[in-house]
Amino acid sequence: MAGTHVTFTVDDRAVLDMLARQALPPGSDVMNRLGEYLQSSTEARFKTQTAPDGSAWQPLQPRYAKRKKYAKDKILTLRGYLRSGIHYQVTGDAEVQVGSNTKYAAIHQFGGAIEKPARQAIVRYRSEAGRVLFAGKKHQGATERQVTIPAHQVNMPARPYLGISAADDAEIRAIILDWVSSLRK
């Protein structure tokens, strides 16, 4: 799974020994249940806009918030691609990975600096009531000018969405206990 992910591993010798004695493939059902729960829990963080530790995500920069077209009040959500890109994968008898394969998933999870190289661009502007305004491609009467945008750095704050909260930990234990209880019947 490309992008970023969190791995959950069952490392309890008693549970693993019990799995080894079962006729069922080890952990197949419980690992899928854990993966489904963790995927759902991770997706829910986009509604609460909080990290697994319960802290609020850092707010949007005012300039970006002002020009954001969709979901203006939502952090890490423009069209929902990051949230809908959360998936889980059972990778072993006792392991589930939860993550996203979107190319920008890691920068949002961990934060960091994005280096933007210098580039050429065409700027379109128009004048209205003595003010200079940017104009779209189709705007008639706009003046075009080629400009050089210098190299610069964009600093992205970490807004962790992957991880296990205290509530997740309790639910994981409940799912495993429920599953172990069902094996004993």
Please tell me what each predicted stretch does.
Residues 1-185:
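Short, Lys/Arg-rich flexible segments
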